[in-house]
């Protein structure tokens, strides 16, 4: 008789413990139900990137001295630099510069170590294409500045979304500074 009673007591304790665990997880689920949605409706709303965001690389042809430091510090030897030595002035003349963004890992080493600051990272992150050969940007394509997300009036940015309007009570423009 005694083993049967202890068995029922263990069963009761296990049932209470299981109910407590289920109740705790249910309370966590309910606490998350009150939060505002985090999802961004991508084609219509774009996330404003931070100033340290590592997007597409911008290249200024006139500043480049063809030193090839960017190629040496790149972990995958990605930038292709074609140059010719001008014998009359005894300097390198840059002929072609290209980066294949299908291979680039966006580490930023080329930008960091460039002695003339001819490379910089932009906020552009929309590089998708149907043909991988279109991701090979030459000096002309690298020299184009991207359209700023804040300055693009066709896109409703996250700063003007309903989430911010609810939190602050008024819509924000692109010049408003917020502390998150």
From Swiss-Prot:
Its EC number is 7.1.1.-. Keywords: 4Fe-4S, Chloroplast, Iron, Iron-sulfur, Membrane, Metal-binding, NAD, NADP, Plastid, Plastoquinone, Quinone, Repeat, Thylakoid, Translocase. It is a peripheral membrane protein. [4Fe-4S] cluster 2 binds at residues 74, 104, 107, 110. One of its GO terms (molecular function) is iron ion binding. Its cofactor is [4Fe-4S] cluster. It is found in: Plastid, Chloroplast thylakoid membrane. NDH is composed of at least 16 different subunits, 5 of which are encoded in the nucleus. Belongs to the complex I 23 kDa subunit family. This is NAD(P)H-quinone oxidoreductase subunit I, chloroplastic. It comes from Platanus occidentalis.
């Amino acid at each position: 008789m005694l083993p049967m009673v202890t068995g029922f007591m263990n069963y009761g304790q296990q049932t209470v413990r299981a109910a407590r665990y289920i109740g705790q997880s249910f309370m966590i689920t309910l606490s998350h139900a009150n939060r505002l949605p985090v999802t961004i409706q991508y084609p219509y709303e774009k996330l404003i990137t931070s100033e340290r965001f590592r997007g597409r690389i911008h290249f200024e042809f006139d500043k480049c001295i063809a030193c090839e430091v960017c190629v040496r510090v790149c972990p995958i030897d990605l930038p292709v630099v074609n140059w010719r030595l001008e014998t009359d002035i005894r300097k390198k003349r840059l002929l072609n510069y290209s980066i294949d963004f299908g291979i680039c890992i966006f580490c930023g080493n080329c930008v960091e170590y460039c002695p003339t600051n001819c490379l910089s990272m932009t906020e552009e992150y929309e590089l998708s294409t149907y043909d991988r050969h279109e991701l090979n940007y030459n000096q002309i394509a690298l020299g184009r500045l991207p359209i700023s997300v804040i300055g693009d009036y066709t896109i409703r940015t996250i700063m003007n979304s309903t989430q911010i309007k609810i939190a602050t009570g008024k819509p924000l423009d692109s010049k408003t500074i917020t502390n998150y």
